Structure formats: C-alpha cells, structure tokens
Amino acid sequence: MEAMSPQQDALGAQPGRSSSLTGMSRIAGGPGTKKKMKTLAERRRSAPSLILDKALQKRPSTRDSHSASIDTCAFLSSFMCSSRTLLIDGPVELKRGLQRQERHLFLFNDLFVSAKIKYNNNFKIKNKVKLADMWTASCVDEVGEGNTNALKSFVLGWPTVNFVATFSSPEQKDKWLSLLQRYIALEKEKDYPKSIPLKIFAKDIGNCAYFKTISVMNSDTASEVINMSLQMLGITGSERDYQLWVNSGKEAAPYPLIGHEYPYGIKMSHLRDTALLTQGSKDSASPSQLQEPFLMEQLPREMQCQFILKPTRLATAQQLSDSSHKTYKRRRSIINWAFWRGSSTHLDNLPVSPTSPMPGQLFGVSLPDICENDNLPKPILDMLSFLNQKGPLTKGIFRQSANMKSCRELKEKLNSGIEVHLDCESIFVIASVLKDFLRNIPESIFSSDLYDHWVCVMDQGNDEEKINTIQRLLDQLPRANVVFLRYLFGVLHNIEQHSLSNQMTAFNLAVCIAPSILWPPASSSPELENEFTKKVSLLIQFLIENCCRIFGEEITSLLGELSERSDREHTPDTSCFQLNDSSYDSLENELNEDADAPCSDLVKRLGQGSRSMDSVLTLSDYDLEPPEAEGLLTLSNFDLDQSKEEHIRTKQPLETKPVSVFVAYRKVSLGEHTRAPDGPGTPSCLPATASDARKVFRRHRRSSEPSIDYLDAKLSYLREFYQKKLRKSSCDAVLSRKDEDYLKQTQPQKKGDQRCFKQSSVTGTDVSKRNTANENIKKKSLSGHEGIQETPFTKSKPVAISVASYMSSQDHSWEQPFEADACRFSPPHIADAQKSSRAHRRCSEPSIDDQNYKLSYLRGVYSKKQSKTSCEAGLLHGEEDYLKRHKSLQMEGQKLINQSLVMGIEVGKSSSSTNQSTEKVLPPRLNLCPRASYSSLSSPGTSPSGSSVSSQDSAFSQISEHSVFTPTETSSPIDCTFRAQRKQEELSSDCDSPSLVSGMPGPSTGQASSHLAYLRKGTTEQLPQMHSVTLHPSTWLRSGLVTLKNWSLKKKTKAARPEDRKDCSLKEPLELPACAAGTPEADSLQESQEDIHLGVDEGAGQTACGLSSYACQDSEQHASSPFCLAGSRLTLGMKLHEGEESGGQYPCDNPWEGAPSGLETSEDAANTGVEPATVCNDGDRH
C-alpha cells in the first residue's frame, strides 16, 4: 500500500470523491488519518443506505464496483441453470401495513427471489417463490398504510401475503410490472392440472349449506371463486358483500383475500410445502392427478389449507383483529395512541380500537340514541356495577391489559343485544370493553367541540373556579352524557378510595382512562396534541378527586343501590363464577337454606357479584358447618381416624355393637362434664382419643380458611340456633337426649349400688393383656372373650359393654379415684365399638331404624331389671333357657368325670393330647353360648400321671375368683378343714395373682383384687347343711391328701358304672383349657403335684372327685347393666370328714343333702377391705 500507481494517486487526491465509493482511505492527512476517517464515515451511514446508494447510482467502473458485481455473480450462481435466466434485478421498498422493508429483488424466467442486503455486499435470501404462484394488482391503498406514491408502486404478492412494492422511478415500476405479468402468465400455462377441487366453508351465513366443493382453475381469482361459491351455496347477493378467507399453517390467524389472489396457487403451494405432492409428468393420467389435491384431507387439521366465506361486515371486524394488519396497528396504538385521531387523515374512517366491531346496537352510537328517557342501557349499568364491586379489590384495574379474544367476543355479544353474565368474565376484560365503549362514542363523551374549553379548565386559579367551570361545561353536554359521567366517576372514585390495595391512585386512573374520554380534533399538530393530552389527564384526575363536589354526594349511594340490586338479580341463577370454591359454595348454600341463621343477613349483603377472595375469607371466619357437623363437634372424644384393622372390624353388623349409643351420649352431653368434680376437660379423666378429636374433626377444611376455638366461641354462639337443626338432621343427638333423661332418673339407684359395683371382681377386659391360653381358647369360641370381633352376636345378646368400660364412660363423675383408673385404662374393644358406630355413616347421622331399635330394647332391659336385685340387672330375656343349658351341661360333665374314674390312668396319659384336641373339636351344643366357658376337673387322686393337676391348673386359670364348690354325685369326701397357718401362707402367696380372673385380666392388680362375687342364698332345707369355708385350689389339694387314701378304699365297694358310659365319655371330649404359664397357681400346683403322685400310688386310682366348673355369664352379657355378675362358678361335691384325727368317713348317699358347699376363692379381707363371701345354694340358681 505504500507504493501507489499514478491513477490511484489521482483518484485519491480528488477532494470531492467519497471514500465510501472509492474504497480508498488515502486523503489529506496521512495514511493513519485517512483510515480513521473511513471508519467514521461508515459509522455515520447505515449499511443498507450505503449499499442502496451504490445500487441506484451509475458509477464509473472502479475496483469497488467490480467487486460488487463479483458478489452478485457469486450469489446468482446458486440459482442459475440451463433453462433459467435472470431477467432483471434491483432494489425495492416493500411495505406491509405500517412495516417497511428494504429488499433487493431478482426476477428469473420461472422464479422470484427476494434478498436482504448486508453491509459487506452480501445477500441473505428472504423469499423464493415460483412465478406460477404469484400475483400482481393495483389496489395499493388496501394493502399498505400511510402515504404511498401510486406512480412508483404496485401490489406484489404470493401465498399468502401482499406487499406494496415501491421502486425508484415510475419507469422502474412499469418495467417490473410488465415483466412480472408476462412471465406469470407463461408459467401458469405450464401448470398441470389446470383445475383442482376446492372446498369452501360458509361461516356466519344463515340458511345455507355448511360447505361446498367447487372446481377452481389456476387462473381464477378470489373474487371469481366467491361468485361461484355463492351460486353453489344458494346465497343471494354480490361478491362485494362477502369475503374469502384462507386458513393455512403458515400464519396463526386466518388471512383475508382482497380479491386478486389465486386460490389455486395458494393450495398448490401449500401442498408442495408439505411434500405430499410429487412432481408428475404431463403424460400421466388425468384422474390420478385430479385426486392429488384430495391428499389435503389426509393432513392434520392444523396443517390443512381451508377457505372460508364470510360476510363483508364481519370479515372487516375480523380483519382488524386476526389478520396480519392487526400486529402493526396494535404496535402503533401502543406507541402513540394519544395522537391517533389527528396524526393522519386516512385513519379517520377506521374504528379507533383495534378490537372494536362495526357500529351496531351499542358501540359507535351516540349516548342520546341508546339511552331511553336518559336511562343508560342495562349492559352498561351491569358493567359499571360489576366494576364498582370488584374494581376496588383488583390490583391494576384499568391498567392491566385483557385478553383480546375475550374482549372481542364480549363486545360482539353486547353489540348484538345478547344477554351476558358478567360474572363469567374477567374484570380486566370488562374494564377494557368499557374503555372501548367510551372511545367509540362519536365526538367523545366530553364533546370534541368543547375540547378547548375543557383543556383550559386546569388554567383556572383555585379549585372553586375549576369546579364552577366544569359544572358549566357539563350543562352544555347532552343529559345522557352527564348521567353516564355520574356513574363513571362514582366508580373511579370508589376505586381511588382503595388505592392502597389496588395501587390505582387518581393520577394512575386518569392516565389510563383520559384518552378514552376526550381527544383533540384532527387539525391539531403532534406537539399540541402531546401538551393537550397532559392537560386532559390532569383534568380527569381533578374530576376523580372532587367528583362528590361536582356531581353531588348522592353518587355514592347511587352506586350502593346498584350493587345491592345487582346482587339480588345475579345471586340465585349464576353458577359460573370464576372464584368457584367447593368449601365456599357449600358454606354459602347452607347459609342460604337456613333463613333464620345468625349469619344469613351477612350472606344477603355479600351477593354473587361480590364474591371476591376477601369475601371468601370473611365468610370462612364464621366457620359455620352444616347441621350434621354439630353432632361431630359434640362427639369430640371419638377417635375418627381408624386404622385398617379397626376399619375391618367396623364391617360387622350394627346390631353387634349397640354400645356406641351410650358412649355417644356421654360425649354429646358436654354439660355433664361440667358437673364432674374436676370440671370439663380434666386430663386425667379424658381418654386418649379425646385430645386428637379436635384435630381430626377439621380434616376436610381448606388450609387457607382460618380456624377458631369452636368449643368456646362457636359452640356458645351457635348452640341455641342449631338445637332445632339437630332434631331434624342428627339422630344421635335426639336419641341421646332421651337416654340422658332416663339415666338421670336411674342415677340414685346407681349411686346406691356404687359400693357393690366397686367390689365386682371384673372391671373390664383388656384385649392387649390377654395371655396365651386365652388366645387359644378364643379361636374355638368356648371361652372366647374376644369373640366380639370375630363372631356376630346372637339375638339374645345385642349389647357389648363390659363393666369397666361402662363405668369409665358413664360413672366417672361418681367416684374420683375410680374415675381416674377407669379412664386411664380404657378397654380397646370399647374404642372399637365407638369407631364402628361411625363406619358406614356420613358425618354423625346413624341408621335411624337400627339405633332406635337398640335404644328401645335397652330401655326395656333396664326397666325389667331395675325391680330385681341390682347385681342381676344385666341378665337378658333368655336367662332361664341359658341356665337350663348350664344344668344339663353340668350333669354331662359329672357323667364324664365318672367315666374318667373308671379309666383313671388312661385318661391321665391322654390328658395332654385332650387339651389340644378339645380346642379343635367342640361339642355342637357348646356353640350355642360362645361367650360362656366350661371346664371339668378330674379328681386329684385318680391320675397318677399328674393329669388331674394339669386339669386343675388349667381349670383354675379359667375360672374367676367367684367359685362355689357344691356337692355332686361323685364328689370326693375330702376334708375341708385346714390349718390356720397353712391357710395364711397359701392365701398370701396365691391370692395376689391377677390371673385368678379367668380370661379377664383387669387393668391393674389393684383392680383385680377389689371385687367380690354376689351369690344367691339357698333354700331353708340346705342352709343347715352348708357352711362357709374360704378355700383356694392349691390349699384344697394339699389338705385333701390326708383323707385321700381312706376315701378311695371305701369307694372300691361301690358298683362301677356300665361300660356304655365309657363309650359316651369318649364321644364327648372335655374341654381342658391350658393354664397360663408363669402364674402363681401354676407354681403352687406344681409343688402339690408330688404329693398327689404319692397319694395315687397308695390308693385306688379308679375313684375321683368330680369337679365341674362353668361360667354362667359372659362379661359382654352383664355389660347391659351397671353391674357385672360373677363370670363363672365352680361346683364341687364333697363329703366332709368329721375329724381329721379320727380318720372316719362321712357317708353321703344323696349328694345334694348334707354335703357342705365350698365357697369361692377370694383375696384376704384384710388386704382388700371387702366383706366375706356369702353362701348360696347352687341348686337354687338352677
């Protein structure tokens, strides 16, 4: 670069030569300065204008122009082929709507290319179209906007767009137009097939077919296709009244065709773009080619090219919103919307809003024409009322933009007179439509003729003068305009009062709504329009802040009346409110049903139109529940969360657990907790489930809804009102109230029996503490104390209550010490009964028939048993039959014992196997009373192998402490006189075990040792022969060894039983329950086993003492009354010896006469503080 040719030096020395054209950087100032100046020059001038300069100016052939031509040749080389020639190329300005683009066009004999010029003389291809698919027209004003020189421009288009092409000169324009028309026609002659079927859909046209398929030639324009479609569809009118739209996958919205386009070229181009139509030869069969356009039906709907015929009026409105023109118009409205009406004259004939329809019944009509007797139309009043209710609670109201499609649909409905439910619309859509309605009022609502006067208002001195001037101007407006302004500024004032929440101050509202209220005339300049717009905004702000002084104070009350009236009209039948919430709806529906509810007036004030989120939260603070929920509130101690095991139990029939009625009553009656010594809610008196009830109760409430103390505030507030609701919707509460009165009457009798009740040996059953022996027995249901969960009850036992559970749930207020114990050890099966009562019911509503039957039956049982002894109050209707079965079973047990005396050693050897087999094979008659337990004991002196000891051990583990030994036919004459020292030792060591209560361990050892059995007294004939002896099984065994030998020898003389009795004993196996291991009885009996072996070795092993034990009543049977009888009795026939020293025998021929009866085993009276047991004759019971 340092050495330069003379020619380059001369060119560089020319002072007027532009460096951009020569490309030289050598000007005056040295090489570094010249290079720097070139860079600055390129920065000042944009790249497109620089290249356009080079393209339009004729320059001498220099190195730069040569390089540019090289770049063009390099670009064109990719399009050139043997049959394609370049006809012309040159720069052009393409305009579409408000958008202008600089392009460089290349026209070939069959192809049209549009490229974008880059700053480095390169081209970027933007469009490449076949000439057969192109069209030209002269309707420049319909395609482009703004000032367009028609002498240098024409319309150029291809699927599916139209542009206004402007050239540098009219000569260039004519040259391009002639070449395009000529070669487009030549290419169309090459099209094959010349015609294709085209499906035309009719939309918004009544009384015509939905679509028709017509045959379209490749040279038919859109206008010609409209004429053919009208004839095929049977529509009268000219093609000017209708417009053809095309919906293709290239553009998101349907595109309107002006009339000069070729529908044939649009559809064929679409097929080529989808690559479904291959290039066919002209010699192919015509029918196959005609079927190719039908491949369009195989495309997805979004890819199909559809042609739609619409009326011109609706098409015009659709064009403003959905066509490609919409984008550019919206862009302009956002930038300089304040100057629309005065910026250019060509926009005056178009609607101001891009979504406004053509003038109809509402929009675009002056207010005096649509207001009858100066009353606003109902749609306008509805929108104002809706905005007055929801606007103050909406952030950014009148500022945030709305969905344009929703706005257009709402406007079309309002403009056509269709009734609209505004509750289904967004509040932003309604605000946008209201502003659009204001913008479409001819000459504005403030009147454009008074524009100068309105602008000068803010130039007044003080506020009073401004107000007076405004009022004078308002008097000059039509009355309908003033009425509308009163409502409008009342709404704006209400929104401004809540500006802290919605962030819309008077200034913000004025900026958003001022352009829709007043705009400058068309003759104003942009500078004046900008200044006037600011003054109009200040004027609207002043009107909002002083609307009460300008329009009067009554505008506030007027809006209030509108709000209430709208609520009454829309609340009953509106079901599509957007803030739809299931909990909210159910709450308000319940309040609407209860016209006399305490909060019903609140619901009347908060109508359907005012269902904002704040109103939802306000109503949820009341937290009112349906009437059924009140029963759940009072039943707060129920454990509503059930485990899977408990849920399985609840599937039993309801009649198996009627105890839930009593438990429900105790929980419903909150007042009785108050009468308790410790007051309500004492932690030591409430079961474990009571603390979780409040948490479980509200499990269906929404997390957003606040919760209040419903036991204190809400119950005290609503209890009086919901008393009558309980009578018609909650059967539990009604039936429980009747039982409350009944139990109050029987409460003195319960208090009288309190002492006897405390002495009961059975205080409840604890399923979790049952031993292994009882679990085995439970499987066969003979002594199954847990049978309530596995076997349904019979008809004679509908009540499932143990004494402990009954006392803990109802009588905890009688005795505080016992109350604490009972509540602390609440039986689990009672909790199961509570849960099962709510298994198949919603809320607290039970099955009315079942519960009514249960309560009626329980009342009858109570009334019958109150007249009897208090300890016998729990017996049911079938007691006589039940005791007869016991008598017969007792006799059978005695007969089996007689057979065991004959089989002595054999029975002893098979005793272990018998214990196992009896659990599997049960006598059928024993299943009649599954809750009772039966056990038979062999004599302690008949089994050398110790089977009698194991039998006695298991028997004494099954029976309770209330055992009565009575004589039988085969009773052993064992002496029952014991030494005082041995008696004290045995009782002190054995009577402390809780296992003495067979199958029913108490909650604690203290409870197990604090009960006494009540025995009936015998007849006068037997009393002289009876005497009471405190007896324990282990003590009885040890003392009986003394007389065992003599008794067995004398028994040999008696005749043996027949052999057939032996067979009967084998057919009817005895139930020998297993004894719980590890109990004190087992230890003591084990010690006495050796002594028994010695006695057996000495004496005869064929004689035995028949021991028969059975439990006459189950704990579940006795639970129907407040008392529990002895669960089982042990009868023992014995013949007492007159003296241990003499060794004589006391003969007994009749076992029922003269045989003394042993008494039940019990604890030491000194330890338990319980009265000694009384003697009763067992025969009297039977």
Swiss-Prot record:
Site (Arginine finger) location in chain: R399
Pfam families: RA, RHG20_PH, RhoGAP
Protein name: Rho GTPase-activating protein 20
Domain Ras-associating: 194-283
Low complexity bias (residue ranges): 933-953
Keywords carried by this UniProt record: GTPase activation, Phosphoprotein
Domain of life: Eukaryota
GO molecular function annotations of the record: GTPase activator activity; small GTPase binding
Polar residues biased stretches: 757-775
CDD domains, per the entry: PH_RARhoGAP, RA_RHG20, RhoGAP_ARHGAP20
UniProt note on tissues of expression: Highest expression is found in testis. Ubiquitously expressed in extragonadal tissues.
PH domain span: 86-187
PANTHER family: RHO GTPASE-ACTIVATING PROTEIN 20 (PTHR23179:SF28), T-CELL ACTIVATION RHO GTPASE ACTIVATING PROTEIN-RELATED (PTHR23179)
